Amino acid sequence: MSDPTPVNLEPVSVEDYVNIQRLINRYADAVIHRNGVQWGSCWTDNAVWDLGGGRLVEGKEAILKLWYAAMGGISSVVQTVHNGDAWVGSSANEATGRWAISERMRRANGDSGILLAHYDDAYAKVNGQWLFTRRFLQVHYGGPADLSANFTNDKEQLIARGIVADV
């Protein structure tokens, strides 16, 4: 989903952009408020959640099961959406997008950390509402809040993940 580059893609209409952004915001709000029903309502039944590193989860039921298990290991979390865009898909009811996020969290064991990442998304309009058909998490940093762990978005690592990087 990282190629072609966004500059070569046609943006969705303003109305679709706003509705997709509402989907993104509803997702982040559900993470913050630990609301699995709300979080699950963001996905199509046959969606795919790609967490990178070969961790691919298929189907809404399996995605929800993993999310509940993951949230069980986190005592508190705030997910923030920073910026993003959405582009026309192969039909009027399909689109793709990219959204930068960060998470600040405290794990159940008391450790705290941050995640800096972006999602490459695919959406479908179902009964007039945009939903995720795929979310591919591209982690750029995951570790202590002091940023002492390694970043994973240097040029070589981006290229290895199939992301166009020319500087």
Give short role names for the model-derived ranges.
Residues 1-33, 37-41, 45:
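Short, low-complexity N-terminal intrinsically disordered segments enriched in polar/charged residues
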Residues 79-81, 114-119:
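Short, surface-exposed coil-to-beta transition loops
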Residues 103-113, 142-143:
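Short, cysteine-centered beta-strand-loop-beta hairpins and adjacent loop/turn segments enriched
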Residues 143-167:
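Acidic/histidine-enriched, glycine/proline-rich intrinsically disordered or flexible terminal extensions
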Residues 2, 94-96, 118-149:
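Short beta-strand edge/turn micro-motifs at domain boundaries
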Residues 10, 14, 54-57, 110:
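Charge-dense, low-complexity intrinsically disordered segments
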Residues 31, 43, 101-103, 136-139:
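Short beta-strand segments enriched in hydrophobic/aromatic residues
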Residues 36-101:
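A solvent-exposed, acidic/Ser-Thr-rich amphipathic alpha-helical stretch
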